[in-house]
Structures are given as structure tokens and as C-alpha cells.
């Protein structure tokens, strides 16, 4: 029993340690792209996990291991699911930015689509609690397509100031659209501020010609944006920008 506690009981502390290096070309494929380059770009990772009592002690004395407090990793009221969703969104954004920069530099065709706002976190006891879920995309507000994060926030403020607290939203959840009415209310611990009670970010997608596929598996976080960009560029142009390294 004691051994199980020492090995498995999660503490409110994280251990960060070195991960692995990956050849980015194994995860990025440009349609009809240049493939005869001699060098490669590498994606470096770190591993972040909750510490058990035994791992906590081990990390204290192990080179290149670092103990990190919970509030350095998690946002306020963020649970495990919300944390994982935020990390996945950061990786999606990293890939979007890499495609945008690479195609902008090469003057090849691309199109950016604003999909709506992406729900990262639901504040417990807030207006959206029990209605919205982390990972939802809000695509319309009161019949209007959401074309920017600023537009969405401004519409919420305008409706609140006009005394309209019942707000109709169209939600995309797992590629299924549905409508919900959320009633604005005071956000807990906000000193009287009224709103939806969600943390959100922009949801954008990009289509390119030629098509690019990025499949990084379970790696999350804001990693590898520069390496993705360089690898995409390297496959788009004839030049070997790795210079053989």
C-alpha cells in the first residue's frame, strides 16, 4: 500500500525533464514536395508530468530534472481535461502559424478561414457552466457569423449594456452544429463583472496549394513552430535550406 502511494499518488507539483528529438520531415508532408535534401530539422521535446512522492525526491537530485509548481503550469480553475485541450490548441496554432509564414514567404496560394472562437476553459458557476464544454467552437452569436475574437467580445459587451442577457449561440462540437441560449450572469470572483464565464481564443484554419499534412501524434504545447516552418519551406523549394546538416 505504501509503495503504491509513493509511486502513484499525484502531488500538486510537476516534473519537467528532457524528452526526445524527432526528425520533422517524418511528420510533415508537402504534396509533390522536394524530398532529396541531405540534412534535416529536429523537433526537441520536454516531458511534463505530475510528480509522485518518489519522483519528487528523485527529481530533487537528478540533473536536468526540474520541479514546477501547479500555478506555473495550470491556469486558474483549469482541470486535467482543460489543460490537455489547451495544449492541443497551442499545437494546432503552432501548425497554423507555420503554414501561414511558409506560404507567405513563397507567394504560393493559401486561404485563411476564421471559424469562430474556441472555448478553452469554463469558469465554475459562470453562465456557460453546464452548457458549453472545453473544445467547443462558437461560430455564431445572435444569428451573426463570428469573424473575429474582438467582434465576439464586443457583441457580448453591447448586448449586456443593452440589458439583453439571453444570448443565442451556435456551437460546433465534434463537427456537429447546435444552438444554445446562454444567460449572462456575474462571473465568480470577478468583482461584479457580468459575462459568459469562459476563456476563449481564435479558431482559424488554413488551406494551401499544394496541400500540406502535419501529423505530430500526441505531442502538445506551443512546440516546433519554427521547425515546422523551415521543414515546410524546405519541401516547397528546390533549395536544400538545411545545407546538408
Where do the protein language model's features map onto the residues?
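Short, solvent-exposed loop/turn elements at domain surfaces
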Residues: 53-57
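Helix-boundary/low-complexity linker signature
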Residues: 64-66
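Hydrophobic membrane-insertion alpha-helices, especially the h-region
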Residues: 1-10
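PDZ-domain C-terminal substructure recognizer with occasional recognition of PDZ-binding tails
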Residues: 106, 153-200
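Hydrophobic beta-strand core residues of beta-sandwich domains
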Residues: 122, 132, 146, 159-161
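PDZ/PDZ-like peptide-tail recognition elements
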Residues: 15-35, 41-51, 70-123, 181, ...
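Conserved PDZ fold ligand-binding element
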Residues: 128-151
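Terminal peptide-recognition signature
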Residues: 103, 128, 135-138, 169, ...
Amino acid at each position: 500500500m505504501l509503495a503504491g502511494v509513493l509511486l502513484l499518488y499525484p502531488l500538486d507539483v510537476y516534473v519537467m525533464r528532457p524528452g526526445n528529438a524527432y526528425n520533422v520531415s517524418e511528420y510533415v508532408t508537402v504534396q509533390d514536395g522536394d524530398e532529396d535534401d541531405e540534412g534535416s530539422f529536429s523537433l526537441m521535446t520536454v516531458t511534463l508530468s505530475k510528480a509522485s512522492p518518489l519522483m519528487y525526491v528523485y527529481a530533487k537530485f537528478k540533473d536536468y530534472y526540474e520541479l514546477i509548481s501547479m500555478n506555473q503550469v495550470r491556469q486558474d480553475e483549469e482541470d486535467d481535461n482543460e489543460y490537455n485541450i489547451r495544449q492541443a490548441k497551442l499545437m494546432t496554432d503552432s501548425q497554423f502559424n507555420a503554414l501561414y509564414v511558409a506560404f507567405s514567404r513563397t507567394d504560393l496560394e493559401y486561404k485563411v478561414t476564421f471559424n469562430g472562437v474556441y472555448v478553452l476553459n469554463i469558469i465554475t458557476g459562470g453562465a456557460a457552466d453546464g452548457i458549453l464544454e472545453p473544445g467547443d467552437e462558437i461560430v455564431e452569436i445572435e444569428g451573426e457569423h463570428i469573424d473575429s475574437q474582438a467582434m465576439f467580445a464586443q457583441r457580448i459587451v453591447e448586448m449586456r449594456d443593452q440589458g439583453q442577457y439571453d444570448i443565442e449561440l451556435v456551437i460546433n462540437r465534434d463537427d456537429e452544429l447546435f444552438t444554445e441560449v446562454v444567460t449572462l450572469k456575474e462571473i465568480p470572483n470577478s468583482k461584479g463583472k457580468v459575462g459568459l464565464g469562459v476563456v476563449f481564443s481564435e479558431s482559424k484554419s488554413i488551406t494551401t496549394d499544394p496541400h500540406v499534412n502535419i501529423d505530430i501524434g500526441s505531442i502538445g504545447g506551443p512546440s516546433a513552430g519554427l521547425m515546422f516552418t523551415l521543414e515546410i519551406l524546405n519541401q516547397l523549394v528546390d533549395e536544400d535550406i538545411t545545407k546538408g546538416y
